[in-house]
Structure formats: C-alpha cells, structure tokens
Amino acid sequence: MTKSVKKNIKNEISIIVANLALSKNIKLDKININIQKPPKSDLGDISILIFELSKTLELPIATISEEIIKTLKSKYEIKAMGPYLNIKIPRKEYINNTIQMVNAQKDSYGTSKYLDNKKIILEFSSPNTNKPLHVGHLRNDAIGESLSRILKAVGAKITKINLINDRGVHICKSMLAYKKFGNCITPEKAFKKGDHLIGEFYVEYNKYSQENENAEKEIQDLLLKWEQKDKNTIELWEKLNKWAIEGIKETYKTTNISFDKIYLESEIFEIGKNVVLEGLEKGFCYKREDGAICIDLPSDSDEKAEAKAKQKVLIRSNGTSIYLTQDLGNIAIRTKEFNFDEMIYVVGSEQIQHFKNLFFVSEKLGISKNKQLIHLSHGMVNLIDGKMKSREGNVIDGDNLILELIESIMPEITQKIDNKENAKKNALNIALGAIHYYLLKSAVHKDIVFNKKESLSFTGNSGPYIQYVGARINSILEKYNALSIPIIKKINFELLKHEKEWEIIKIISELEENIIKAAKDLNPSILTNYSYSLAKHFSAYYQEVKVIDINNTDLTAARIEFLKTILQTIKNCMHLLNIPYMLKM
C-alpha cells in the first residue's frame, strides 16, 4: 500500500529526533511529530512544530531545526521560521503519490488505525414511544450514525446502541388519552404511521390535563396499574408501544440509521436497583430514616432537588428507582455484555447535569472501573419562535420534514426524470442529503435553527451542493467513456500543472488527518467543512479548465484520473456523513 509523502516525512523526522535523543541518552517512549498546515500557502505545503520536540530533547529549537534541514535539504525545500519548519514538497512526487494512493485504496482511502481495535459503544437516538421522531431526534441520529462511521474509519470497533424509553409517566399520558378518546382507532384505520397516531394522543392528553384537575391522579393510577401488571393496562401498553416502535423503525430505515443492539427500558430498568443495593452493602451508599437509599454528590454538583449536602436519592422510600439508577444498571449490563473501553452517550445539552452525576456515582460504586464514559452534549434544534415542545404539538416532525423537502424539489426533478418512482427516489436522497448535512455542519454543541430553504440550496454550503458536485464529476467521466478514446497505459501526471490542480491535490491528501480530527473531537462538522472546501475548489477548477480535450489525449487522461480521485474522496466523505451519493441529479 502506498505511503503518503507526509507520512514519509514524518518517519524521516522521527528517525532524526530518535538519533538526537540517543546522543543525549534520553529515552523516548513515543515520538510525536506535529504536522500542521502553514497559515499561508506560499510558506510551504506542511509545517512542523519544533517547540514540543525542543522541550523533550532539552535542545534549542534552532539546533533541532538545523539538524532536520541538514538531513532533508536534498529532498525538500525547508525553511525555519521561529518554532516552525516549513516544508515544500516536490509537486511531481506529491501528485503521483496522492492519485496512486486514492486509486489503490478507493473506499478505504482516508482510513487509519488511529484507534486500532478500541472498543467503543455509541448510545444515541433513545426515543420515547409516545411520539414520532422530531428534528431534534434527527440531529441526534445524524450525529450518532456519522460518528459511528468516523470512529470505525480510524480503526475503532463500534457498537451502536439504542435504548427505547417505553415506560413511565410520559407513556401513560398517551395511554390515558387513547383510553378516553381513541374509539378503537388503529394506524390502519387512521391511515397513519403508528408513532404519529400515538403522538396525537400525547398532545390530546396535554389539552385534557389543562381542563381536568384529576388528570395527574389518573396518570398515577394508570402507572400503578402498569407496575402491578394489570392485564388490561399491559395489553393496551403493549399495543400502543408496538405501533409506536414500528413507526419509529420505519423512520430509521428511511433515514439510513441502524443499530447493533436495541434495548427496551421496560426490560432492564430494575437492574439498576441491584447495583445500588450492592453499593449499599459495600458502604458506598447509605439508607435514610425513611428507607430511601442515597449517595452524596460532589460539592460542585448543581443538583437542586436534594438537601444542601448534595444528597442524591437512588432508590425512593417506596422502593421505586430514579432514571439515574436505571442508567447505572445499563452500564453494568453493557460492561458484562461488551467489555467496552469507552461509552459515548449522544444526548442533548439539557442532560449535562444528569450525566455528570451518573459518571460520578458509577465510579464511586465501582461499576465503570477502567471504562471511559463520555457525554457528547449536542445543542438543540429550534423553531423560528424558540424551543420545540411536543406536548403542545409545536414541533418539527421528522417524517413530515422529509416529505416537505421532497415536495419542494419534486417539480424540478420531474422536469429531468419522467419515471415517477425514480424521481421520488432521487428527491428522497436529496432531502436526506439536505437534512443530514444541515444537522451536521454546525459544531455539535451549538443550538441551531433549521432553515429548509438553506438546507436545499444547490449552490451553498449544503448537502445537495455536495451531491451535485459528485453527480457532475460522474457525468464528466461518463461523457469521457462514451468518446471511446484509446486507453493510455501510462498516464503522465506531470501534465497536471494548473495551480488549482495542485490546490485540490493538497486538499485530497488531507482527508485522513481530517477524519482523525473529527474522531478526536467527536465532531462531524470537520468533515462537512472539508467536503464543502473540496467541492468548492472543484467547481472553481472546472470553470477555468477544459477537462476533456480530444486534441490532447494525454492531458485529458491525466485530468480524468485526477477527477476520479476527487470523486472518490467526496464519496468517502459522503459515506461518513450518511449523505446518499447520486450518479445523476
């Protein structure tokens, strides 16, 4: 497999550093060569930060820089600038190397062993069975699915988990409304997906509760019946949950979201109690006079529901558990089942304190020993007039958002595609590209306002624009193949002398480091930015350059291979972002 020029330079500098360390009797466990992009392209193609090496080797920056320059000056143009070494790489070698590497690796181009075999669990989505997925869920799903692909691309072993919340007060609200107003309606009779039908009853309960003081008591009575396994209550619960879960899974299929393991909260929620009782036996928890089992949170906790001593109830005096206790059980289950190294919870920012408390308690009870637990807190997706509230029905529904985008672009697509089914399939792929890209292009922690018009733009920083560029390149390649130009066995990449070709080659060569950075930062927006940059550079290049010239077949062949590397790189990014690649648009 072809090594990149950057890796060769890194290896060469590592040898120089190792020799310098040996001369000073310094033992190095690991040599970290920090390669960066120079602030200006005229300074060089790559930049090496010498400052950290200076501290490690206990040598002046100038001494290390001089040694590297002396050793490598016959191969590269190198200049020292303060704590940096700026290196210009010979274009011929760089272009040849990059194109050959992309052609050889194809779909695996950009992958690495940065997290080689690290076992990581990603928990995301975690919907309630009382409503359909809204656009906030779609953002959570987009982040979780994209990160699973990014982390897999850097060598991690990924397990995607979905914990479906199918029990509790919020589920009983839909059940109560259905009992009162359902009239035996079914999804089939209503011509609706099951999750949409159940969501309507959740909204109906909110209206009912505003007009009836006994609504809360009715909910508690229904919950008690569920806990006592009342036959009629359980049958109703199972029926409504089945409808909701079937509808939610249909949305997952539409949006290309998948899981390795799906848990139902109702099947595992009691396990956390055993974890807490074991903690009580070991003295990590204590029992209050009223029988509640508690633990003390750290002094910096913002928990306000407990006493001043930051006391946290894990099992109530009536024997019921809280949500945190159930999550303790989940950690115990997953440790036993998967023996993971790291578990990442993709959950909105409103749960920051919950996970802070969970991680503290799990460590104190010893159930997360040698395990890294991470809450990847993502921002909210808002309406123009503020935060979504599904209990009021004021929510951007995920399925309906997809349908709205499809309807917006269908008139344009049907002008190009006569077959209605093919047109609808294309429209769906564009809608998914628009949604996933828009939900991923902002940093994970930021709140966003979903703008439908902006998301569908074919000219701006959007999914459809990336899809369009991919389809445009494919069209050029098809046009070239149709010309039946004689195959040139040895392509001369030295003919690629246009400045924009050089700029694009450098961007293509940076895919691996961008994927690694996205994995390190748990931030897919790094790859949306990268994809947009590559697509923009191609568009500018294509406006200036004639790719197919039948009077210059050697240059045409070189440029066609060059376009293949651009397309492969874009396709690899689209896969990592869960954006459908389209041959035609």
UniProtKB/Swiss-Prot annotation:
Keywords: Aminoacyl-tRNA synthetase, ATP-binding, Cytoplasm, Ligase, Nucleotide-binding, Protein biosynthesis
Paired cysteines (S-S): none
A GO molecular-function annotation: arginine-tRNA ligase activity
InterPro entries on file: aa-tRNA-synth_I_CS, Arg-tRNA-ligase, Arg-tRNA-synth_N, Arg-tRNA-synth_N_sf, ArgRS_core, DALR_anticod-bd, Rossmann-like_a/b/a_fold, tRNAsynth_Ia_anticodon-bd
GO cellular component entries: cytoplasm
GO biological process, one term: arginyl-tRNA aminoacylation
Keyword Translocase: no
NCBIfam families for the chain: argS
Subunit structure: Monomer.
Record-given protein name: Arginine--tRNA ligase
This protein's encoding gene: argS
